């Protein structure tokens, strides 16, 4: 059975020592370390630092398969504004000059790959940002050249990062998500094409942001079977009837009952995890199933505990025989 891990990004208010203790109590087999809080600090990731992290997890019998640096990755391609100051450390945001922020973020993503190699993991999950997300809705009219320029900008900024990852034996797994260069199947295909199929680029598969958009989240697994480097298990619910705030959210906050969609604890939303597991089996995905737990209406300790149990219950190994072969005996 695949290991069930907990993504620590939503738990950065807790020390890594405390979270290790709790993750064991919740029922997890390992952690996916976020590169914020004290969970994994890229700028401090010397050999000794990485060894101490490995020893801490080993003390709690927790495995480690990946690290995640979504916040820094977001700044590599984004049009930088005051929002980024809230998610970036001062050494990356600096004076806020947009190109300077993007360059420092790119250098930090290279450093993240180097730190991952020292830590002994071969996957870095994260975001890419996008210079063209604001062009999502084609009015005022958006020309094809404007979109092409956005993908070209993405490739120019990320190819040097990915070249470094390839040399290190590390892969970058983009979490396909609104505000990124890829947010559905069509844009994911275009991102791969823009990178000339770079072998170090793939996906941290997360069905939640695909489902409420109306994207075939099971087909995503088959379409990119050789580029599913990591899997996030996250559920989302969306309404079967019209709501006051639609897919775009109506500038409401998560948890607002007027919303069309919202994150749910695993097993309590609309995502069909049965079909996801079957698809992962068919492509022979052997990596971790990492819970990214979000549900604004539920206590997180309760939710993270039930999520670990849910994933272990829904996962199953593929068959190694044809069930009807016995009919021939």
Where are these regions (language model features)?
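Hydrophobic faces of well-ordered beta-strands that scaffold small-molecule active sites
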Residues: 2-8, 31-33, 64-69, 124-126, ...
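Active-site-proximal loop/turn and secondary-structure-junction residues that shape catalytic pockets
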Residues: 10-12, 35-37, 70-73, 128-132, ...
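Active-site acidic/histidine proton-transfer and metal-coordination neighborhood
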Residues: 13, 17-18, 22, 59, ...
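Short amphipathic alpha-helices and their capping/turn segments at secondary-structure boundaries
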Residues: 17-24, 44-65, 108-123, 216-229, ...
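Conserved, mostly hydrophobic/aromatic
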Residues: 23, 31, 57, 67, ...
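Acidic/histidine-rich catalytic cores of soluble enzymes
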Residues: 30, 67, 148-270, 316-327
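Glycine-rich, proline-tolerant flexible connector loops at the mouths of alpha/beta enzymes
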Residues: 34-54, 131-135
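C-terminal helical cap(s) of enzyme catalytic domains, especially alpha/beta-barrels
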Residues: 300-320, 327
């Amino acid at each position: 059975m695949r290991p069930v891990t907990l993504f620590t990004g939503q738990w950065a208010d807790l020390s890594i020592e405390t979270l290790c203790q709790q993750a064991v109590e919740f029922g997890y087999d390992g952690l996916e370390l976020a590169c914020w809080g004290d969970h994994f600090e890229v700028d401090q990731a010397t050999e000794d630092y990485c060894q101490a992290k490995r020893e801490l997890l080993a003390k709690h019998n927790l495995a480690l398969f990946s690290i995640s640096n979504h916040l820094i990755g977001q700044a590599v391609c984004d049009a930088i504004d005051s929002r980024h100051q809230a998610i970036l450390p001062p050494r990356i945001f600096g004076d806020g000059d947009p190109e300077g922020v993007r360059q420092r973020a790119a250098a930090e993503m290279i450093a993240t790959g180097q730190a991952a190699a020292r830590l002994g993991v071969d996957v870095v999950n994260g975001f890419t940002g996008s210079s063209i997300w604001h062009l999502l809705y084609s009015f005022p009219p958006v020309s094809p050249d404007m979109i092409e320029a956005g993908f070209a900008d993405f490739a120019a900024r990320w190819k040097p990062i990915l070249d470094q990852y390839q040399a290190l034996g590390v892969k970058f797994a983009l979490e396909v998500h609104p505000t990124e260069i890829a947010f559905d199947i069509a844009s994911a295909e275009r991102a791969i094409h823009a990178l000339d199929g770079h072998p170090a680029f793939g996906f941290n598969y997360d069905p939640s942001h695909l489902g409420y958009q109306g994207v075939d989240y099971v087909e995503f697994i088959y379409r990119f079977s050789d580029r599913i480097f990591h899997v996030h298990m996250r559920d989302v619910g969306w309404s079967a009837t019209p709501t006051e705030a639609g897919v775009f959210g109506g500038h409401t906050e998560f948890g607002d009952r007027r919303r069309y969609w919202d994150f749910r604890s695993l097993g309590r939303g609309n995502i069909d995890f049965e079909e996801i597991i079957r698809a992962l089996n068919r492509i022979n995905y052997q990596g971790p199933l990492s819970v990214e737990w979000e549900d604004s209406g539920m206590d997180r300790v309760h939710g993270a505990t039930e999520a670990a149990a849910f994933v272990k219950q829904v996962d199953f190994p593929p068959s190694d025989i044809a069930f009807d072969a016995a009919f021939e005996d």
